[in-house]
Amino acid sequence: MLLALAQWLAQDVRFFNVFNYITLRAVLAAMTALLLSLAAGPAVIRWLAAKKIGQAVRNDGPQTHLVKSGTPTMGGVLILIAIGITTLLWGDLTNKYVWTVLVVTLGYGIVGWYDDWKKVVYRDPNGLASRWKFFWQSVLGIGAALFIAFSAKSPAQTELIIPFFKTMAYPLGVIGFITLTYFVIVGTSNAVNLTDGLDGLAIMPTVMIAAAFALIAYVTGHAVYAKYLLIPYVPGAGELCIFLGAIAGAGLGFLWFNAYPAEVFMGDVGALALGAALGTVAVIVRQEIVLLIMGGVFVIETLSVMLQVGYFKYTKRKYGEGRRILRMAPLHHHFEQTGWKETQVVVRFWIITIMLVLIGLSTLKLR
């Protein structure tokens, strides 16, 4: 929106040409989203509290979490509003990838919002039925996969890129690409949601990964840099920097209120949407494996739940009683049960994410 205005004004005042630079607009997007989150946060929290949209806490969870009962949830709405407004302000609205990530993000946000709403307003502990949640996640994931696949301009835009190797890329074909894209988007969405169990635990890794992928998107959308780094050139992908900058800014603004002790929780509306956003971006810039590396915390949290549930069902069938691998899943609760304080778990997981993000960025050059 503002880009179009700047381009029109640039016909008479050359200064406005500066807004054609993606890097400048990405920084402005991050700042705008941050300020929007900080400014609107108190009002959103007050509204959620007034409507008694509070978090229910598991009785079988860590006893230290019982004090969190009633804390306003669905704060992810604040993040999505900041991301949406900022991207529309600073993004190139003629870019197909901008609309792709916006539609997917807001679509998953709506699914998460309805799930949260049923839990906290209608007091339904199960929220949106799992089959319906999975159905709508699948519709959005497959829809995005089809659009990206059939709008690709070259075979390289649908190949699986293997990090650390100069020329190792596997042609996926349409079916393979759609399948991979589906699992990346849906899987990342649910992985972030599973991780969102402690104050600040999910949002800061999301901010770090978004910032790192902003750099990746920039070089992927730049023909010269992409050729130099031996990565696929995806025309228009650079514009995702604005969207990713908005995620980073909105996420930091939300962290202001979500840091321990949290004044508000993200809820499924935020976690599902942010995970889907990261997954969609990774697919567009052809760096799904790099997302797997950077999002290692999300991956291990998801695996901990899968192993815990799988082992419990297996032992119950074999021995007549279910047994557990961990004291409690997801993994962050296991560490709490072993004596780690909540803030220790969160900060240590942040440190791990910093290391993984640096490893992921190193794949751009180490080939």
Curated annotation (Swiss-Prot):
It holds the Pfam family MraY_sig1. The chain crosses the membrane at residues 27-47, 73-93, 97-117, 132-152, 167-187, 200-220, 237-257, 264-284, 289-309, 344-364. Pathway: Cell wall biogenesis; peptidoglycan biosynthesis. Its cofactor is Mg(2+). It catalyses: UDP-N-acetyl-alpha-D-muramoyl-L-alanyl-gamma-D-glutamyl-meso-2,6-diaminopimeloyl-D-alanyl-D-alanine + di-trans,octa-cis-undecaprenyl phosphate = di-trans,octa-cis-undecaprenyl diphospho-N-acetyl-alpha-D-muramoyl-L-alanyl-D-glutamyl-meso-2,6-diaminopimeloyl-D-alanyl-D-alanine + UMP. Catalyzes the initial step of the lipid cycle reactions in the biosynthesis of the cell wall peptidoglycan: transfers peptidoglycan precursor phospho-MurNAc-pentapeptide from UDP-MurNAc-pentapeptide onto the lipid carrier undecaprenyl phosphate, yielding undecaprenyl-pyrophosphoryl-MurNAc-pentapeptide, known as lipid I. This is Phospho-N-acetylmuramoyl-pentapeptide-transferase. The gene is mraY.
